[in-house]
Amino acid sequence: MHHRGNLSETPADAGRYAGHSTGHARRVLVDKGIGSVHQELVVAELEPGGSVDSHLHAFEEACYVLEGALAFEGDGWTEELGADDYVFVDRGVVHALRNVSDAPARWVEVSAPVPGGALEDTVFTASHPLPEGVEHPYRKWHFDVAALPEPSGGIGLAGFGAANVGGAVAKIIVGADTGASQFNLMVVQYAPGGFITRHDHAFEEGFFFLEGEIEAELGDETSTLRAGDYCWSSVGDMHALTNRSDGVVRWLETQVPQPPSRYQARFTADWERFVAQPGS
């Protein structure tokens, strides 16, 4: 199962923040409605002077600012977030958002487990004790694309060998090493000619493209996706990516749940070679 779309063609509303926000719009890229059982992926916006009331969630959340400026309020602190800043918010932590600038602010938001179950997973409250065991209610960082290493094969992820990946670089910016337990959020970049061959996973992946264009093979469909496009691949859905352009392509990618310690990907070519060995 897979899904793809374009941000400008995706409907916007306040979603679960209706009545608890002003100047807030959310474009849902991935959620239960398209078949996901693990994650919600959203591009959200706050108009100048807009705000989202204090609340807490029964899921983990990460926000990556695309443009504009956000005031993030969490655990009694206020953080100013600008383009390419990102924040991880632990489950059960009260937080709020404001746009105190004179321009709209936009960000990518990933939440897991997938919101909208039988549990009341978003609660609006001005304050609440931290959950037991939470030492860092939220964490903030800045991503600098210039700090990415040179593209290569393998990309540093378990099971992604050089025969199946080339001209690529990936950096996990939110994951187990930064306090998240439910998902990985990555920045991925392919040089011209960069590729990953046909494969699947035991986890879902979501993609939001920031720069350039890529040929995406999703199941039996092949499409060219560009900045502002997005796609999603379910557990067991075969997919491949190739940069056939003359420029770099870069995107934000989610992996939900976090991948296993081994066999993070099953590559078609690897398996076909294995079963073709003499004696099989």
Predicted regions and their residues:
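A short hydrophobic beta-strand segment most commonly corresponding to one strand
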Residues: A62, F88, D102-D121, W232, ...
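Short acidic-glycine-tyrosine-enriched beta hairpin
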Residues: G76-R91, D220-G236
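A structural feature that tracks compact, well-ordered secondary-structure segments
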Residues: V42-A44, V110, L185-V188, T197, ...
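Glycine- and acidic-residue-biased ligand/ion/polar-headgroup-sensing regions
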Residues: F59-L70, D75, F203-E215, G219
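A short, N-terminal "cap"/entry segment at the start of jelly-roll beta-barrel domains
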Residues: M1-H38, A118-Q182, R266-S280
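Asparagine-centered strand-capping/turn motif at beta-strand->loop junctions
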Residues: R98-S101, T242-R244
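Conserved short histidine dyad/triad with adjacent acidic residue
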Residues: G23-R27, V42-H57, M186-H201
